[in-house]
Curated annotation (Swiss-Prot):
Organism placement in taxonomy: Bacteria, Pseudomonadati, Pseudomonadota, Betaproteobacteria, Burkholderiales
Keywords of this entry: ATP-binding, Cytoplasm, DNA damage, DNA recombination, DNA repair, DNA-binding, Nucleotide-binding, SOS response
One Pfam family per UniProt: RecA
Name this protein carries in UniProt: Protein RecA
Record keyword Methyltransferase present: no
One biological process term in Gene Ontology: DNA repair
GO cellular component terms given for this protein: cytosol
Species whose genome carries this gene: Burkholderia mallei (strain ATCC 23344)
Annotated localization: Cytoplasm
Disulfide bonds: none
Function: Can catalyze the hydrolysis of ATP in the presence of single-stranded DNA, the ATP-dependent uptake of single-stranded DNA by duplex DNA, and the ATP-dependent hybridization of homologous single-stranded DNAs. It interacts with LexA causing its activation and leading to its autocatalytic cleavage.
Gene3D superfamilies named among the record's database cross-references: P-loop containing nucleotide triphosphate hydrolases (3.40.50.300)
Origin: domain of life: Bacteria
GO function term, MF aspect, one: single-stranded DNA binding
Length: 356
């Protein structure tokens, strides 16, 4: 009996000490600096922005890329890294958000971005001279609290000032890795606070002397791997042909890391030259998988009505009838437990129809 009284006394003392500590922390660092997870506001719904690919939104588990987080997209050359990020920018702009593009590679094709649905006059662009300058610009934009999304293209092009000012053969090991590590330590908290999505595009390098395992690695050290909430590995796996002409690439994206949903899922979609991700093609493929769209031989039909013979014709039908495409997409999302597409994030064809 005495022991139980003693135990309850200690518990009461601990509770009082904890309450005093929490009050002191809140007084020193502000309200909300520490809280219990059950207090309501601690757990928030993750806000997302669509990737422009229905399959990838589903593979990410939350319906898109999470805001207030760092995302890394990496892959070989011409695999669709920049195309994917430009599609995300277009989706963010459709929701009324402001986006910035830090073009460290000095290679952004403005006409191509416009074709993908990016509102180019509203896009903020910077072409910095050094890695330090690029990351300082990112820091200033994030701290302003008025930017919804920033893309850095690419980590490999963030060249430290010392390297630019030095001689061609100078050995400066670990300089870029230290720069990235310092920048991410500084940025992460602000990114979360301002709910800004920051996407780093990265390139692949080969590790020398690797006999077993994967010899591929990404540039810029290990910091980005740790600080990223989502890491996407994008690869070109085939070509899309119309008669004998190659009109696009078949692309696979693997979710290598995901802190907001189970990882290791993947999505396969088409990237058409001059158009970007073929959302209509994905709706057809995923609709057939979910048994929402019927396929008999070469014919595709929806709700008993034929929508086209062959994938190209069915894709064209959905492009001309965006309301049917939206209906099928929302049914696919519903069947897979992913949030329905918001009204503002219409397809490109729908927006063009409205403008006309």
């Amino acid at each position: 009996m005495e022991e139980s009284k003693k135990g309850s006394g200690l518990t009461a003392e601990k509770s009082k000490a904890l309450a005093a500590a929490l009050a002191q922390i809140e007084k020193q660092f502000g309200k909300g600096s520490i809280m219990r997870l059950g207090d309501g506001e601690a757990v928030e719904d993750i806000q997302v922005v669509s990737t422009g690919s229905l399959g990838l939104d589903i593979a990410l588990g939350v319906g898109g890329l999470p805001r207030g987080r760092v995302v890394e997209i990496y892959g070989p050359e011409s695999s669709g890294k920049t195309t994917l990020t430009l599609q995300v920018i277009a989706e963010m702009q459709k929701l009324g958000g402001t986006a910035a593009f830090i073009d460290a590679e000095h290679a952004l094709d403005v006409q191509y971005a416009s074709k993908l649905g990016v509102n180019v006059p509203e896009l903020l662009i910077s072409q910095p001279d050094t890695g330090e300058q690029a990351l300082e610009i990112v820091d200033a934009l994030v701290r302003s609290g008025s930017i919804d999304m920033i893309v850095i293209d690419s980590v490999a092009a963030l060249v430290p000032k010392a390297e630019i000012e030095g001689e061609m053969g100078d050995a400066l090991p670990g300089l870029q890795a230290r720069l990235m590590s310092q920048a991410l330590r500084k940025l992460t908290g602000t990114i979360k606070r301002t709910n800004c999505l920051v996407i780093f595009i990265n390139q692949i390098r080969m590790k020398i002397g690797v006999m077993f395992g994967n010899p591929e690695t990404t540039t810029g050290g290990n910091a980005l791997k740790f600080y990223s909430s989502v890491r996407l590995d994008i690869r070109r796996i085939g070509s899309i042909k119309k008669n004998d002409e190659v009109i696009g690439n078949e692309t696979r994206v693997k979710v290598v890391k995901n802190k907001v949903s189970p990882p290791f899922r993947e999505a396969i979609f088409d990237i058409l030259y001059g158009e970007g991700i073929s959302r209509q093609g994905e709706i057809i493929d995923l609709g057939v998988q979910a048994k929402i769209v019927d396929k008999a031989g070469a014919w595709y039909s929806y709700s008993g009505e034929k929508i086209g013979q062959g994938k190209d014709n069915a894709r064209e039908f959905l492009r001309e009838n965006p309301e049917i495409a939206r209906e099928i997409e929302n049914r696919i999302r519903e069947s897979l437990g992913v949030a329905a597409m918001p009204q503002g994030a219409g397809s490109e064809a729908e927006i063009m129809d409205e403008e006309e």
